[in-house]
Amino acid sequence: NYWLCDNRFVYQENKPYPHIVFEDFLPLDIANLISNEYPNLNAETEHYKVRNHEYVDRYFLEDTTKFTTSIQLFSNAVNSRSFLLFLETLTGIKSLLPDPYFMGGGAMITKQGGHLNIHVDFNWNQKLQLWRRCNVLFYLTQNWKEEYKGNLELWSKDGKKKVQDIIPLFNRVVIFNTTSTSYHGQPSPTLCPKDVMRHVFSAFY
């Protein structure tokens, strides 16, 4: 598969650490379905965990039983054998395993003014007793505009300098290695209208 081989090279060579950005990653009908059925913050706030302090302001939902059937099937797909084999070939990391609990991941929502300071994710998954190696982010807000800000930023390995700035456009996917130096975040508060929210589904491996 020349496409995958080419992208594996791109992944390994990208700075500040191995990562890649894919456009129109999911079939459009599936991306639209997931976006339209994304857990509603107003109706299901009681299911979301809330992080709201100086470092982060966002909602996240790890419990897949609270998802619609379509999003449950999607969450199963991102943990499937075929997707794991794709990730292993792309990243060069062998024997990847999914996190079926979506600890620190799952469905995430950032409202107007929300942010996430530059950080590194915890690398040790206590529940699975395994090291995290890779993170996949699926951006799922239809008609997201550049002026809404809320970009994903990848910073240098010493955490002192921004290197990449990625707009969370609809059906864009970002994959990157999870290490003790993979600094990233969304430090710029979202400027979206109150009726628009930044949706991202996060999976760790």
Where are these regions (language model features)?
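A structural signal for well-ordered alpha-helical scaffolds and beta->alpha junctions
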Residues: P27, I71, S80-L84, E88, ...
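Conserved strand-loop elements at the edges of beta-sheets that form or border functional pockets
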Residues: D24, I109, P168
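Catalytic core of Fe(II)/2-oxoglutarate
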Residues: G113, D121-C134, T141-Y205
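Non-heme Fe(II) oxygenase catalytic core, chiefly the N-lobe of the double-stranded beta-helix
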Residues: N36-P39, K66, S75-R132
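Non-heme Fe(II)/2-oxoglutarate
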Residues: L4, R8-T91
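A structural signal for short, well-ordered beta-strand segments and their strand-loop junctions
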Residues: V21, L97-P100, G106, I175-F176, ...
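Proline-centered turn/helix-capping motifs that create local helix->coil transitions or kinks
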Residues: N42-E44, K94-L97, Q142-E146
